[in-house]
Each structure stands twice: as structure tokens, then as C-alpha cells.
Amino acid sequence: MSFSVEVLAGIAIELQRGIGHQDRFQRLITTLRQVLACDASALLRYESRQFIPLAIDGLAQDVLGRRFTLEGHPRLEAIARAGDVVRFPADSDLPDPYDGLIPGQESLKVHACVGLPLFAGQNLIGALTLDAMTPEQFEVFSDEELRLVAALAAGALSNALLIEQLESQNMLPGSSGVFEPIKETHMIGLSPAMTQLKKEIEIVAGSDLNVLIGGETGTGKELVAKAIHQSSPRAVNPLVYLNCAALPESVAESELFGHVKGAFTGAISNRSGKFEMADNGTLFLDEIGELSLALQAKLLRVLQYGDIQRVGDDRSLRVDVRVLAATNRDLREEVLAGRFRADLFYRLSVFPLFVPPLRERGDDVVLLAGYFCEQCRLRLGLSRVVLSPGARRHLLNYGWPGNVRELEHAIHRAVVLARATRAGDEVVLEEQHFALSEDVLPAPSAESFLALPACRNLRESTENFQREMIRQALAQNNHNWAASARALETDVANLHRLAKRLGLKD
């Protein structure tokens, strides 16, 4: 069988019928798999010497989370270098990247493979891979026919990447206008929750607003900060990271704002702080809720006026810094308890983002597992690391209280265990290789983190916030003022006075 004009026209029509790029990509490879009667097809994007799966058909779901480096996959490297159709013989010594990843045939090797590099002009932007268990499957199709398919796919991918680039505001003022693929930030996931988060990141990235990123421990808040920075006009300048929880009080101010020689014992020279390092760029303050009230006041001044003072220096320095902050605490409760400044909270949370916990991300668990499996494979020098069907079900049924970080550690541990019990360099992860426990402390929900009262000014915002927290405390404590005061960690007399001022009691 060979391609007819009708078949090629059908493929082109399918590319136009999809709603959104992802749907078009999926239609393309599904149609190709049917036309070619092969066992698996995949559309991959090329970036930084690796191929990133965009859509698959006939392959295990975790393939979408894997990142295939050229160094780790000789067949994909051959496709990237070829510039034309690549046919791998059935007896090729080069391992297939999808060995063990075709459902129902995990123990069998892929026999026939065709690779089609995709170009935008002279730039490699991706590849189509076609795999079959029958060695002669692709012999009836000529190279010219396969080139036509590659041209259709390359056009669709090139247009999609260009639109993505424009939508993400990567065509910045003063840029050359040359097409450049978007750099990946490893925010892996196709669930509705992650899709919504990515949309919100796109919305806020092009602005200069401060962003407060909330979410449970281990959800990937730092990746969100990186994604915002890389998609912003400040991407050409530094993204500076500071973990506020790891700062001793004695050096915290110096870390943030710098110091001059002789400012304190041990200050043997002038030193720039994180704000100076991030000038014209972005400063990411992780665990912002751990800062002392004194430092919060100084941070607020920087956000308000854009100037800093080094420790021991009376002069002010102007800085242009965008601040991204992250926390796993409910800062509204921290404000009411007097541990976090209300004015700073509202300054930071101009555009709040909430990173969903892994248990709310559905099949993203499997995609992330595939990503970590591929990392382990490269790190340990293994030929392949795959998940058994039972292991996939086990991962999907678990609650993941430690979120993505727990999944990463679980995969790494399982690979080590599986490798120890099986000879050779091929590892299959089974259910028994995972020892999972769901003991975890509660964390704030998306609703509690994102809810901000509508208001006209900071004072009104603060009073509305305090009023709502007092109402909640009273409702939860049967309107017992003493119990409510204890819950809010304040004196009952002060609570009465505050409630009276806010109009909650006569």
C-alpha cells in the first residue's frame, strides 16, 4: 500500500479540524498510525539536544513525561543528524527509545522504526517516529511519500510553536524576530489543574506584577517561578533565588540588601545583596512566611519605593526588581496571628497563583513518573527503566501527601531496589518496589490561599480580612469569644476591642 492523494488530503484535513494545537497533534499521529498500520507513533519537539513528546498513540502514557536526550538515545540522535527519512533495519544494534513502552508488549523489542526529522527553514524543530513489531511494515512506503508526511507535520508544528512563542510574549521589543522554540521549564502535566495554572502563568508573565505562589510542600513552586521569569521581558536578566527559611536572623538583612566593609564583625569587604544581584531581573523569595517582622518592614519599603540600603550604609541604591514569593503557609492566618504584615501580604499577592497538589492532578502522576524514570536511566547508565501496568495503577491510586518531591524520591528508590534484584541493565518497576505512606500534615487549600476580598484600598482590605477571620473563628467556636481568641492566638480583650472597631459587636 502507498499514499494516495486522498490519504494525504485526509491528513491535511485532520490537521485543520482540531481545536487547539494538542488536539491537532493527536489527530495527526492517530491518523498516521491508522494509515501506516503501525503499532506506535509519536510527535516530538526538539529543544536543547533533547526530544520532548507532544503527542503519542500506541505508547504507554508515561512516554509523554519522558525527555529523550540525544546522548542517551542513539536512534533519536541519528534522526536529528540525518536531515531526511531514517529507516532502522530490524537487526539494528541501536536500542529503540520505546522498547518496553508499547502496552501489552512490554517484554518485546520494537522491530521496525522510521524517523522523520521536522524542520522550520534550516532549524530542526522536532521529529515523527513510527514503530512496528513487524519488521517489513514500512517497506511499501517510499521515502518521497514519507517526506510529504513530514512536511505536513513540520508545517503544523512550526505554526504551533510560533503561535506559542507570540502568546508567551517571547517576541520582545528589540528582539530579532527570528523564530526560536520556547524553552521548557519541566512543568510536566496535562491535567485541567495544570492547564489552568499554565494559562495563569502566561497571563501574568508578561506583566511586571509581584506574584505570590502558594501550595503544599513539594508541589513545584520554584518551577512556577522559573516559568514566570523565563516567559517575561526580564528573562535576559538574572533570576536570583533566596530561601528565607534557611536564613539565620543575624545575616538575613545582609543577604537581602548587602553590606559595606566594617558594618559588623566579619564584614571585611563590601558585598552585594540579592536585590542588587537581581537588578533588572527577578528575585524569588521562597518560604516568604519565615521572614521576621522587622525584615518584612524593610522588604515592604523596597516594594513601595524601589530603593535599598546596604547594612552599615546611609546611602540608598535604586533597584528595579520583580519579586516572586512562595509559601506553603496560609498567610491570611499568619496576618491575623500577627506573624505577617497585612500590607506586605497585599503587596505580594497582586496576582496569587496556587500550585495544585499531586493528588488533584490525575494522570499527571504517570507522566511525571516517566520523567523521573528517564532521569534515573541516564544517571545510572541503564538501557531502559519502565513501569509495569501494576506499578502505574499503584502510583495512580496513591494520595501523594509529599507531592511531586515524594514521587521523585519514590521512583529513584524503586529503581535502585529493582536494579538490585534483577541482573542486567534493564529495569522494570513493579508494585512491590514502592513503599508508600500517607502520613502528612495539612496544608492550605487553593480556596483559602487565593481568596482575596474585593476592596478599594489597603486599609479597607485589611479590615475586611480581619472581619472575615473573626467571623470564621466565632463560627467554629460556637461564638465563644475566649475560645475564638485562643484559636486566633490573641488576647480576648484585644479581640473584643478589634471586633468593636470593626463593627462586629456593640
Curated annotation (Swiss-Prot):
Residue ranges of domain Sigma-54 factor interaction in the record: 187-416
Pathway connected to this protein: Nitrogen metabolism; nitric oxide reduction
Residues that coordinate or bind ATP: 215-222, 278-287
Source superkingdom: Bacteria
DNA-binding region, residues: 481-500
GO biological process, any: phosphorelay signal transduction system
Molecular function via GO: ATP binding; ATP hydrolysis activity; DNA binding; DNA-binding transcription factor activity
Entry annotated with the keyword Phosphoprotein: yes
Cross-referenced Pfam families: GAF, Sigma54_activat
Positions of post-translational 4-aspartylphosphate modification: D57
Gene3D superfamilies to which the protein is assigned, alphabetical: 1.10.8.60, 3.30.450.40, Homeodomain-like (1.10.10.60), P-loop containing nucleotide triphosphate hydrolases (3.40.50.300)
Keyword entries, A-Z: ATP-binding, DNA-binding, Nucleotide-binding, Phosphoprotein, Transcription, Transcription regulation
UniProt keyword annotation of ATP-binding present: yes
NCBIfam families associated with the record: PRK05022.1
Described function: Required for the expression of anaerobic nitric oxide (NO) reductase, acts as a transcriptional activator for at least the norVW operon. Activation also requires sigma-54.
Protein name: Anaerobic nitric oxide reductase transcription regulator NorR
Taxonomic source organism: Salmonella paratyphi C (strain RKS4594)
Gene (UniProt): norR
